[in-house]
Regions:
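Phosphate- and other anionic-substrate recognition elements at nucleic-acid/protein interfaces
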Residues: 1-48, 55-170
C-alpha cells in the first residue's frame, strides 16, 4: 500500500493507494479502510463488534477477519458514538454486535440507544459471558482484562436479534 497525495497519485495503479484527502477521524475506521484496500478477495465480509458491559466497558472490533480495535470506555455515550461511526463508515455484508449478558440492564441500554441513534439495520447477539474474564497477575491491568473479555465475547455465539431502524418500523 502506498500513501500519497491526491495530486501525485497515478490514475491506474497496480497497488492499493491511500491518498491524503481521506478525512477519517476515527482510527478504527481508518484501519478498516486500509484493510478494505488490501483485501481484494474479501473472504470474510463481516464486521463484528464485541462488548463487555460494565463500569469499564470493554470493546473489540473485528473487520474482514482481523481485529482492528480494542479499547475501554468509561461512558456509554462515547461507546455508542464510536459504534455508530464504525457501522456507518465500514461496509460489510454482515454487521453484528455481540454483547455479554453479565449486566443485562446495561446491555438493554446499549441496544436501545443504538436503535434510537443509528438509522440502519444490524444484528445484535447477546452471548453468555461466563469464563470470558481472564486472570491477570497485576490488579492494575483491569482495563486490559475488560478488553480481552470483549474479544472473547466477539468470538462466541448467542441469540441473534435483527434490529431494524425505528424509521422503518414506526
Amino acid at each position: 500500500m502506498v500513501f500519497t497525495t491526491k495530486k501525485e497519485a497515478p490514475e491506474d495503479a497496480d497497488i492499493p493507494l491511500l491518498t491524503d484527502d481521506i478525512s477519517i477521524k476515527n482510527l478504527t475506521v481508518l484501519r478498516g479502510k486500509i484493510l478494505e484496500k488490501l483485501d481484494d478477495v474479501r473472504l470474510e465480509d463481516e464486521l463484528i463488534i464485541g462488548i463487555d458491559p460494565g463500569k469499564r466497558t470493554g470493546f473489540s472490533v473485528h473487520f474482514l477477519g482481523s481485529e482492528i480495535a480494542r479499547s475501554l470506555y468509561m461512558t456509554i455515550d462515547k461507546l455508542i458514538d464510536d459504534i455508530i461511526s464504525i457501522l456507518s463508515q465500514l461496509k460489510a455484508k454482515r454487521r453484528l454486535i455481540k454483547i455479554g449478558d453479565g449486566d443485562m440492564k446495561l446491555t438493554n441500554k446499549i441496544t436501545n440507544l443504538l436503535n434510537l441513534r443509528y438509522c440502519s439495520d444490524f444484528d445484535i447477539e447477546v452471548v453468555d459471558e461466563s469464563r470470558t474474564t481472564v486472570k491477570i497477575k497485576h490488579f492494575n491491568q483491569r482495563g486490559k482484562r475488560d478488553m480481552l473479555s470483549a474479544r472473547y465475547i466477539s468470538q462466541r455465539s448467542g441469540h441473534v436479534n435483527s434490529v431494524l431502524p425505528l424509521s422503518r418500523v414506526g
